[in-house]
């Protein structure tokens, strides 16, 4: 299986997030950049229960020079949040992984009055500069 190591890492991370209550059902996702080819991103699939997944179910996406993304491998289509995850990675070369969660704790933080921490939605990433990630 191609990209086996990165797929296993993403699968282990999503299962730990589910176990700790950070992600419920299929809401949320984890994406990780490949260490050898930084245009390759492994991301959890869309609409699939995480608890029954295998490494080959993790989607592989290739980031293109024009800013688009192409699903190149995986049993299931990638999360609909691919544009948000890859845009963060494009703007922040130091970021190698993203975790998108709807956990109660993340929601509370996003509702706070900290001017340094701004909530980010997928449409914002496409049309608004992402200042802090």
Give, region by region, the residue ranges found by the protein language model:
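Glycine-rich flexible loops
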Residues: 1-133
């Amino acid at each position: 299986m191609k990209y086996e190591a990165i797929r296993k890492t993403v699968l282990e991370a999503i299962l730990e997030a589910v176990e700790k209550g950070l992600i419920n059902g299929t809401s949320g996702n984890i994406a990780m950049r490949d260490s050898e080819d930084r245009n390759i991103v492994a991301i959890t699939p869309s609409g699939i229960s995480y608890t029954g997944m295998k490494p080959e179910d993790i989607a592989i996406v290739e980031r293109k020079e024009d800013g688009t993304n192409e699903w190149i491998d995986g049993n299931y289509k990638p999360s609909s949040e691919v544009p948000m995850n890859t845009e963060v990675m494009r703007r922040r070369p130091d970021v190698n992984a993203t975790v998108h969660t709807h956990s109660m704790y993340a929601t509370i933080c996003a509702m706070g009055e900290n001017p340094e921490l701004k909530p980010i939605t997928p449409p914002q990433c496409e049309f608004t500069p992402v200042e802090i990630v």
